[in-house]
Curated annotation (Swiss-Prot):
This is Elongation factor G. It comes from Buchnera aphidicola subsp. Acyrthosiphon pisum (strain APS) (Acyrthosiphon pisum symbiotic bacterium). CDD domains: EF-G, EFG_III, EFG_mtEFG1_IV, EFG_mtEFG_C, EFG_mtEFG_II. The lineage of its organism: Bacteria, Pseudomonadati, Pseudomonadota, Gammaproteobacteria, Enterobacterales. InterPro entries: EFG_II, EFG_III, EFG_III/V, EFG_IV, EFG_V, EFG_V-like, EFTu-like_2, G_TR_CS. It comes from the Bacteria.
Length: 702
């Protein structure tokens, strides 16, 4: 079976936004206008197609990235059918990992902003992630029908707060109750969508007289932005010649794909206005897979030779697994993006990250949580596979005879932990299975057993993240559990360098004995740097090379549970430079135990300290409550970094220890009568104050 849509007519896009910007509603309208949904699903009645988890429908927020495929031929049927693969991503900061991993496999993004709230805290986080992966993007200013909507104010915020170069393609005609359509700044025509058929059809009209001057000004801005990096067009423009519509669009597209400009459209998804023109902009100004740079990777060889794959069906197969999801009927679904080549159901491929073979049982195209089985997928496709046994997020799947490892995704370390205990014996068996499955799905969620208390500890990116995990355990796996109080993920490190630390493990009392002897040096590393560095400085074979890895392993085991208070040890270097061995009695175990003993001894001499996680907190509050909010942040050991003035509210930026932020959402609501909002993300680890450290260490010793 050959490809039905040429790769030049593919668009792999993500839809991203701050919570409550109307992103899921925008996606629902896209699905309606492209013909997949015959009835529009609304978020506020829990019927949205892309929000298919029960928790999402209850809370009205998007938690996981649902993927769907649809087709669009243009508002006026002016294009050949284009295939749009859409990833809908969450807007809550606890689910940033979902945004991160979808950005990794996308070619373009649509950023949705609220015409009232504008650029909000999470918008900046998502923008940084798009910058990191160099994703071209267009913006959609939504909710133009809401009280306080102001399109040009949001355009200005995109410029100032995100450091972008925004170029509006449209102007809003009216705002709030009087929002009726948009001015197309390329055609210089007013566009009105008909209410009688939910905006499926539209008409071009003359620009309202009161908007002619403003439209001319922004049309000139658009044309100047288009010709700026095209000498031929610039000369034509300066000579006073009229530029054609296709010349303007082609020049804008080139600059948008190079991330030099961000094109902006507007509308009201809820009122069925503007999403249709947004779809046209996706086709005209976002890249096809063959517009973007070739994907980089390394060959699966000793030298790790750099290699590339281009978006071509004839190239060797390569794909990236970007999400694992559990399905109640078929088990694990592995979402993957094909970068090159073709794969059919039944094919055996190579998982180069784990150096093992995998067989594609079945391949399905996803539409939210509905599946359509397909026989094969091509370069540029996003699909899900059933039957892959040992694939995890970030693994590369490739041709058996032409292996490559594509650049892996980076996942943040969890910052908050809670203990979970099953209520019954039956729950205990099911809980292990449930947590294993959930950890496989979500790389920012971790599970471990506390060595001292034997409790199961789960860790994640925030309180809401762990709440959802516990909720899913109950709903999807019928596991009832008692949940402990949130715990902070502290770390341990050292401040001083110490030398001549001796570790011995010697037992020689007849028969085969044990002999391991090491001398090491401990030294601090740059904070947030390499984490752990092992230097083998053994000269003259005083310790045989076969025991070196056992010494390294013995130290690494101690890093998991630090000598100070049992927290992981970070930013520490170990230099092994002397020791001795016995021809008969030395063993890997003896050297491992000797290294562990030396590390424990040296750590206590090297001025050990406790590190606490510091969060970057951004609070948006009405002016009236600013004093209360700042006072409360100060009481929480927060440091106010700065403030920004919005028209009706203030933004407060602060750095606050995570341990002081538990329950903050409730406190902020009561302080501001529910009118303030905040976002919080991990910033860095710093030394915890003496009194805090003392309390924690004493509690751990009891």
């Amino acid at each position: 079976m050959s490809r039905t849509t040429p790769i030049s007519r593919y668009r792999n896009i993500g839809i991203s936004a701050h919570i409550d910007a109307g992103k899921t509603t925008t996606t629902e309208r896209i699905l309606f206008y492209t013909g997949i949904n015959h009835k529009i699903g609304e978020v506020h009645d829990g019927a949205a197609t892309m929000d298919w988890m029960e928790q999402e429908q209850e809370r009205g927020i998007t938690i996981t990235s649902a993927a769907t495929t649809t087709f669009w031929s243009g508002m006026a049927k002016q294009f050949k059918p284009h295939r749009i693969n859409i990833i809908d991503t969450p807007g809550h900061v606890d689910f940033t990992i979902e945004v991160e991993r979808s950005m990794r496999v996308l070619d373009g993004a649509v950023m949705v902003y609220c015409a009232v709230g504008g650029v909000q805290p999470q918008s900046e986080t998502v923008w940084r992630q798009a910058n990191k992966y160099n994703v071209p993007r267009i913006a959609f200013v939504n909710k133009m029908d809401r009280m306080g909507a102001n399109f040009l104010k949001v355009v200005k915020q995109i410029k100032i707060r995100l450091g972008a170069n925004p170029v509006p393609l449209q102007l809003a005609i009216g705002a709030e109750d009087t929002f009726v359509g948009v001015v197309d700044l390329i055609k210089m025509k007013a566009v009105h969508w008909k209410d009688s058929d939910q905006g499926v059809t539209f008409v071009y009209n003359d620009i309202p007289p009161e908007m002619i001057e403003l439209s001319k000004k922004w049309n000139q801005n658009l044309i100047e932005s288009a010709v700026e990096s095209n000498e031929d067009l610039l000369e034509k423009y300066l000579n006073g010649d009229r530029l054609s519509e296709s010349e303007i669009k082609s020049a804008l597209r080139k600059r948008a794909l190079n991330n030099e400009i961000v094109l902006i459209t507007c509308g009201s998804a809820f009122k069925n206005k503007g999403v249709q023109a947004l779809l046209d902009a996706i086709i005209e100004f976002l890249p096809a897979p063959n517009d973007i740079q070739d994907i980089k990777g390394i060959l699966n060889d000793v030298e790790q030779t750099p290699a590339i794959r281009n978006s071509d069906d004839k190239a060797p197969f390569s794909a990236l697994a970007f999400k694992i999801a559990s399905d109640p009927f078929v088990g694990n679904l592995t979402f993957f993006r094909v970068y090159s080549g073709v794969v059919k159901s039944g094919d055996t491929v190579f998982n180069s990250a784990k150096s093992q073979r995998e067989r594609f049982g079945r391949i399905v195209q996803m539409h939210a949580n509905k599946r359509e089985e397909i026989k094969e997928v091509y370069a540029g496709d996003i699909a899900a596979a059933i039957g892959l046994k040992d694939v995890t997020t970030g693994d590369t799947l490739c041709d058996l005879n032409d292996p490559i490892i594509l650049e892996r995704m980076e996942f943040p370390e969890p910052v908050i932990s809670i203990s979970v205990e099953p209520k019954t014996k039956v729950d205990q068996e099911k809980m292990g299975l449930a947590l294993g499955r959930l950890a496989k799905e979500d790389p920012s969620f971790r599970v471990r057993t506390d060595q001292e208390s034997n409790q199961t500890i789960i860790s994640g990116m925030g309180e809401l993240h762990l709440e959802i995990i516990i909720d899913r355990m109950k709903r999807e796996f019928s596991v009832d559990a008692n949940v402990g109080k949130p715990q902070v993920a502290y770390r341990e490190t050292i401040l001083n360098k110490v030398e001549d630390i001796e570790g011995k493990h010697i037992k020689q009392s007849g028969g085969r004995g044990q002999y391991g002897h090491v001398v090491i040096e401990l030294f601090p590393l740059q904070p947030g740097g390499e984490g752990y560095l092992f230097v083998n400085d053994i000269k003259g074979g005083v310790i045989p090379s076969e025991y070196i890895s056992a010494i390294d392993k013995g130290i690494q085991e101690q890093l998991k549970c630090g000598p100070l208070a049992g927290y992981p040890v970070v930013d520490i270097g170990v230099r092994l430079y002397f020791g001795s061995y016995h021809d008969v009695d030395s063993s890997e175990l003896a050297f491992k135990l000797a290294a562990s003993a030396a590390f424990k001894k040296g750590f206590k001499q090297a001025k050990p300290i406790l590190l606490e996680p510091i969060m970057k907190v951004e609070v948006e509050t009405p002016d009236d409550y600013m004093g209360d909010v700042i006072g409360d942040l100060n009481r929480r050991r927060g440091i106010i970094e700065g403030m920004k003035d919005l028209s009706i509210s203030k933004i407060i930026n602060a750095c606050v220890p995570l341990s002081e932020m538990f329950g903050y959402a409730t406190d902020l609501r009561s302080q501001t009568q529910g009118r303030a909002s905040y976002s919080m993300e991990f910033l860095k680890y710093i030394e915890a104050p003496f009194n805090i450290s003392k309390d924690i260490i004493e509690r751990r010793e009891k």
